[in-house]
Structure formats: structure tokens, C-alpha cells
Amino acid sequence: MKIDNVEIITCPAGWRAWDFLRVSTDTGIVGFSDITDSNGAAPAVIAAVKMFGESILGRDPRQYEQVYSDLYRSSRQSAGGVVHKALAGIDNCLLDITAQSFDVPVYALLNGPSRDTVDLYWSHCATTRVRHAAEVGQTRPTALTDFESIGKEVSDTGYRAAK
């Protein structure tokens, strides 16, 4: 099995874009990862992924630890947030591909699950409504009672927490 394509998919989402990485193999197995950066570094993350992506073409994705190590060593003088974000996206794709090739969940490659359940929270709930009410089809909250209503909506939807 060899990596034969590395593609960045940018999905416009109103006021921002979401970036995903798609790594394909010659066997048809495809791995995906979110590489979105919300702190203004998206162009740098994308550039780093493209640079690293060229160097992994033809490599066996199941050798994910060696690939990661080689990429990290090649970037050791510019280690930091952008580089690590790019490396993490590639690593996630290679883990996804490897798990699919063995017909196991990714956690099986990482010494098993660390928990049986994962609590979810409603992320960016009120922040999105304050900053981008029109884009999400909501009214901008302005009073404490508006935020109380949002809290009730979060609870009524089944979430136990919001951010």
C-alpha cells in the first residue's frame, strides 16, 4: 500500500472556512483529518501540509510512526504550532488508513480505548449567536434573559454543558 494523493479540502462555512486533509492510497483506502486553524494561521498550516504531503507520496501509510518521525526531523528547526498542526493532520490520516486496512478502530492502534463514553458539549453556542447571528439564522442575544433562554435550549437539546 502506498500513498498516492494528498489533498486539502476547504469548505466555506459562512464567516470562516473549515479545512480538511484527505490522504488517498493506491488501494482505494482514504484517510481524513480536520486541519482547521481558527487563529489566523490557516494559510501557513495549509502550506506546511502541502510541503509535507509531497514528501510522503509513495510511502506506506501503515508505517505512520516512521513517517511522522521523518517529517518531524525534517522540520526540527521550525518546530512550533503550525508545523505540529500540519503533522497532526497527516498523522491522523495515516492512523485512519492503517485502522481501515486492518479493519479495526483507530483506538485499537493506540493501545485500546481510554474510556467507554465521551461527554459532548455545545461549542461556540452563544459566541456564534453574538458574532454571527445573521449567518446562523438567529437573533443576536443582548440581555441576560436571552442567554438564559440559550442555556435552556442547550439543556433541552440534551447537552449537559456549553462553551
Ranges and model annotations:
Residues 91-132:
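Glycine-rich, aromatic-flanked loop segments that form ligand/cofactor-binding clefts
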Residues 14, 88-89, 144:
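Short alpha-helix boundary/capping motifs
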Residues 116-163:
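Metal-dependent enolase-superfamily TIM-barrel catalytic cores that perform enediolate-based chemistry
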Residues 26-102:
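Metal- or metallocofactor-binding catalytic centers and their adjacent structured scaffolds
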Residues 1-38:
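Structured beta-strand/loop patches that form or line metal/cofactor-binding pockets in enzymes
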